[in-house]
Amino acid sequence: MTTACLMSTYQPLALSFTRGLGTRLWDQSGREYLDAVAGVAVTNVGHSHPMLVDAIRDQAGLLLHTSNLYSIDWQQRLAQKLTRLAGMDRVFFNNSGAEANETALKLARLHGWHKYIEQPLVVVMENAFHGRTLGTLAASDGPAVRLSYSDLPGDYIKVPFGDLLAFDKVCVTHGHRIAAVLVEPIQGEGGAQVAPAGYLKALRERCTRRDWLLMLDEIQTGMGRTGKWFAFQHEGIVPDVMTLAKGLGNGVPIGACLARGKAAELFTPGSHGSTFGGNPLACRVGCTVIDIIEQQALVENAGVRGQHLLGRLQEVLGGHPQVMQVRGRGLMIGIELREAIPELTRIAAEQHGLLINVTRGKVIRLLPPLVLEAAEVEQIVQGLAASLDSASYRALERSA
């Protein structure tokens, strides 16, 4: 396999897939794998779902693109479904999570300017990740920001995730310039870190009191992954702005920025736009994904299977010498290791037919499709335990 013609932005495994079905993928030699990554929280309804395949085929034969110069029926339908599920008022469609977050950041600036703040600030979290555009990188934290680019937009102030005392200190020193707060309910790239109970509700109260926009990045957590349609619903709150992507399209590129109240009224014609955003194909796919999730009760399945998986991982790996902590919510689970094991993803795939992801160097991130079955929970647990044992044994051999 050659990558000579591709820019060097990834270091992929020497593994290529030719087809998928449900939670399974098959490589070029016909070997089967259990997919516990789901394209990084994307293929929530599984690979090659027949309803989705039919919708894509049908729409491709009818109409792919017209632009937002004209009304798009499927765009209206998807907006109605999303606002109903989320308790929001309006939607702007684009093509990715980064674009959705850029839209949210524009809303934050507009909100600040409407409050006569010359240089509005957005409060963001340490270890956050919101995308790879310059604006969203500046709002993020971690190696991608520190090592790659300088002179990023500086209208952000970072606070430790989950630390209300630190947040309140920032409110005292910078409150007159703050326009919005941007936070992930569960930090995905940050290592599947779940916001402490009551944290989002406390942010909601503070934002309401100070007329700041509470903006939630639900790009990984949204569309049922945590056992609710959206992770904020675990806290019984509603944000002012929410961003979606990934699972909304199940592999077809789509992003969405939802807003309510005054945040939904900030844009005017010409103030933002997207050539491909909200095209008929992507929006029909989004509608079909929602229909599948509702018809197959996949939100509920994510909650049940996620609780089962988390419990079994804690039982089996809780005492493993390489494991520090097992955490998560629904089917978004992180296993933090004591040290990095560079070969772990390769060992899991090659020896145990299990696809996993590692973030922050030493946090195994499990994001299986929401169609996961009970027997597959045990397959993930046993495959992961065996992979850790194999990797640990190899490390001991090398050090001997």
UniProtKB/Swiss-Prot annotation:
GO biological process, one term: L-arginine biosynthetic process
Pathway membership: Amino-acid biosynthesis; L-arginine biosynthesis; N(2)-acetyl-L-ornithine from L-glutamate: step 4/4
Pfam families for this protein: Aminotran_3 (PF00202)
UniProt key word Nucleotidyltransferase: no
Enzymatic class: transferase
EC number: 2.6.1.11
Record: residues binding pyridoxal 5'-phosphate: G97, A98, F129, D217, E218, I219, Q220, T275
Binding site for N(2)-acetyl-L-ornithine: R132, S274
Keywords assigned by UniProt, alphabetized: Amino-acid biosynthesis, Aminotransferase, Arginine biosynthesis, Cytoplasm, Pyridoxal phosphate, Transferase
Catalytic activity: N(2)-acetyl-L-ornithine + 2-oxoglutarate = N-acetyl-L-glutamate 5-semialdehyde + L-glutamate
A cellular component term, taken from the record's GO annotations: cytoplasm
Modification sites for N6-(pyridoxal phosphate)lysine: K246
Cofactor note: Binds 1 pyridoxal phosphate per subunit.
Names of the cofactor(s): pyridoxal 5'-phosphate
GO MF term set: identical protein binding; N2-acetyl-L-ornithine:2-oxoglutarate 5-aminotransferase activity; pyridoxal phosphate binding
Coarse class of the protein's main subcellular location: cytoplasm
Subunit description: Homodimer.
Note: May also have succinyldiaminopimelate aminotransferase activity, thus carrying out the corresponding step in lysine biosynthesis.
Family: Belongs to the class-III pyridoxal-phosphate-dependent aminotransferase family. ArgD subfamily.
PANTHER family associated with the record: ACETYLORNITHINE AMINOTRANSFERASE, MITOCHONDRIAL, AMINOTRANSFERASE CLASS III
Stated name of the protein: Acetylornithine aminotransferase 2
Source organism per UniProt: Pseudomonas syringae pv. tomato (strain ATCC BAA-871 / DC3000)
